[in-house]
Design a protein with these regions (language model features):
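Short amphipathic alpha-helices and their capping/turn segments at secondary-structure boundaries
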Residues: 56-65, 104
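Short, conserved "active-site rim" segments that organize catalytic pockets and cofactor/ligand binding
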Residues: 1-57
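Basic/polar, cationic surfaces and motifs that engage anionic cell-wall
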Residues: 1-11, 45-49, 66-68, 75-138
Length: 138
């Protein structure tokens, strides 16, 4: 797979909720009817990285970009505002440190890939922060 993008996502879950691969399987496969979990990597609230899909296998995480991208999801990203769920930067320092490390490693493996947020390739707010600003520091 020719990787042109490394796309960062949030799971759009509350800060108090950690997310497992099992949760993603339930949401993506059982509830959405997808053939597999959509992301290549999950970074949980404590900063642990879970590898889900091989990097040479297309994911299901960004319509129109799946066959040329790698998807990394951070657990979290949701807060309440006036009783409504909204995107928010509520990721832990551990997650951000590990995300930075993962992005550096992936850029070494895919040097021409552009690091973006899901919001940069789709009409969404995911992951709740400007990934391109983080990418400038890599």
């Amino acid at each position: 797979m020719d990787v042109e993008y490394i796309i960062v996502h949030g799971t759009f879950t509350p800060a108090h909720m950690d997310v497992s691969v099992g949760d993603l399987e339930r949401w993506h496969v059982k509830e959405n009817g997808w053939s597999k979990v959509g992301y290549h990597r999950l970074i949980n609230r404590g900063g642990r990285v879970e590898s889900i899909l091989p990097l040479d296998e297309p994911g299901i995480h960004a319509a129109g970009f799946n066959d040329r991208s790698v998807g990394i999801a951070l657990a979290g990203g949701q807060s309440k505002f006036n009783g409504e769920a909204v995107w928010d930067f509520n990721y832990t320092p551990y997650q951000m440190a590990v995300l930075t490390r993962e992005l550096i490693a992936l850029k070494a493996f895919f040097p021409n890939a552009e690091v973006v947020g899901h919001r940069d390739v789709d009409d969404r707010r995911c992951p709740g922060f400007e990934v391109k600003e983080l990418a400038k520091c890599l």
